[in-house]
From Swiss-Prot:
InterPro entries: UPF0253 (IPR009624). It comes from Escherichia coli O6:H1 (strain CFT073 / ATCC 700928 / UPEC). The gene is yaeP. Pfam families: UPF0253 (PF06786). This is UPF0253 protein YaeP. Belongs to the UPF0253 family. It comes from the Bacteria.
Length: 66
């Protein structure tokens, strides 16, 4: 957990304690957020490219349900 930012560690603790809901389809959750980021014209092109690359890489390597 040390390599992740403070906000991620905070949300992790909230989920682990039951204060925040757990999403069983974690890969689907990640892909949904990355897709939203990649499509968001208000974000910088660099951030959108990072989100698109991460989502595409995840689809190729780990998310073979479709």
């Amino acid at each position: 957990m040390e390599k992740y930012c403070e906000l991620i560690r905070k949300r992790y603790a909230e989920i682990a304690s039951g204060d925040l809901g757990y999403v069983p389809d974690a890969l689907g959750c990640v892909l949904k957020v990355l897709n939203e980021m990649a499509a968001d014209d208000t974000l910088s092109e660099a951030v959108r490219e990072k989100a698109a690359y991460a989502a595409a890489n995840l689809l190729v390597s780990d998310y073979v349900n479709e």
